[in-house]
């Protein structure tokens, strides 16, 4: 059994843990900023292909205490790296240290690399490693003097689904968009709307959820090139994911006042394979209205920190709030914003709030209705 670590945005731990449990992995534990679980090497492929809200998948190969560089060196050297890394492997080292005696990240990187080279040198009987072959990205963390180290199976972050070649300014990461849709409890039955859709990330993720389409089917992962992980694991995981897809009619809509953003959103939906069930239109959020008695509205309006001045954002919230109050009572609404005066400008306090981070920006999810 392999222990996997799945980093995630702060505030999304329970959502990611629920995803992992649904995939059938064992000993699932949610901790600050990451999930731990246990599974087989075949589960490495299943996690990468299916996770919507996790940041990446790391196969942990060692966990041990270390308060000195000697303890770090010995702990890393004790790991059987030769079972995973071929002679020509490229093995760069990345990581971080928090609240630990070993606080210098560059020094930790150097010690870890040195320990790995010594272990591999003893096995392969060579002095120099060319590192011209497949990349095996080593990732470590040192938290309160406890070291975790392993191989990054994802490569590029899982938010890179492969459908967004270009975007508009200040895009929302796909993993966070999927989390917002999940928090709204959207399942594909009711209308779904995003009146500030930008490059279309939230409606596209809603469509992937409605169709139960795995988000990682259209991209590559670093672990697909690892010699010890059979190609059949990836093919089986992809087949399993495709067998679970739904095919139906969905009412998913995105609007934005910027015509260029709408063009980009349509192109991204086509790349994601959901252009048959998502409509994008040039529209003013201040005039948004729907007559359907039930629906889901999930949106990420400008915060007034990057795209527009704070006063402009507040006026936008006021006009959008007036339009929102014309919706039937059965609508569930989630708005992601970092603006501390959002509720006052919007014209109604949230029924519930949840703290999240959009990149480095601390935000609240303002929830209205039965969510």
Would you name each region that the model predicts?
Residues 1-134:
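Non-catalytic nucleic-acid substrate-recognition regions in nucleic-acid-modifying enzymes
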Residues 149-185:
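SAM-dependent Rossmann-like transferase core, predominantly class I methyltransferases
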Residues 8, 256, 337:
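Short beta-strand/turn micro-motifs composed of small residues
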Residues 172-290, 305-306, 310-314:
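Conserved S-adenosyl-L-methionine
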């Amino acid at each position: 059994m392999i222990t996997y670590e799945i980093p995630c945005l702060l505030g999304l731990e329970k959502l990611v843990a629920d995803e992992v449990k649904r995939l059938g992995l064992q000993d699932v534990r949610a901790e600050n900023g990451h999930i731990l679980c246990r599974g087989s090497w075949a589960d490495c492929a299943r996690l990468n292909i299916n996770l919507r809200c996790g940041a990446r998948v790391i196969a942990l190969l060692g966990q041990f205490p270390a308060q000195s560089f000697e303890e770090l060196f010995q702990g890393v050297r004790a790991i059987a790296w030769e079972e995973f890394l071929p002679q020509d492997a490229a093995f760069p080292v990345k990581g971080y240290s928090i609240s630990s005696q070993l606080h210098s990240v560059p020094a930790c990187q150097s010690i870890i690399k040195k320990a790995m080279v010594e272990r591999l040198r003893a096995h392969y009987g060579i002095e120099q490693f060319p590192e011209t072959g497949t990349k095996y990205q080593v990732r470590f963390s040192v938290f309160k003097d406890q070291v975790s180290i392993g191989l990054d199976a994802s490569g590029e972050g899982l938010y890179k689904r492969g459908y967004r070649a270009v975007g508009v300014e200040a895009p929302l990461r796909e993993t966070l968009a999927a989390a917002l849709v999940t928090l709204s409890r959207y399942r594909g039955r009711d209308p779904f709307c995003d009146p500030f859709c930008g490059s279309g990330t939230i409606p596209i993720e809603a469509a992937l959820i409605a169709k139960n389409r795995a988000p990682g089917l259209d991209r590559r992962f670093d672990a697909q090139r690892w010699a010890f992980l059979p190609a059949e694991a990836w093919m089986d995981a992809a087949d399993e994911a495709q067998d679970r897809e739904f095919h139906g009619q969905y009412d998913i809509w995105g609007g934005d006042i910027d015509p260029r953003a709408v063009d980009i959103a349509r192109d991204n939906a086509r790349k994601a394979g959901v252009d048959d069930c998502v409509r994008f239109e040039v529209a003013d959020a201040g005039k948004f209205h729907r007559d359907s008695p039930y629906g889901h509205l999930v949106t990420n309006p400008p915060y007034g920190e990057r795209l527009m001045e704070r006063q402009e954002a507040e006026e936008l919230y006021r006009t959008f709030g007036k339009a929102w109050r014309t919706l039937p009572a059965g609508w569930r609404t989630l708005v992601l914003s970092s603006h501390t005066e959002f509720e006052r400008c919007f014209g109604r306090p949230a029924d519930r709030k949840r703290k999240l981070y959009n990149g480095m920006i601390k935000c609240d999810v303002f929830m209205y209705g039965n969510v």
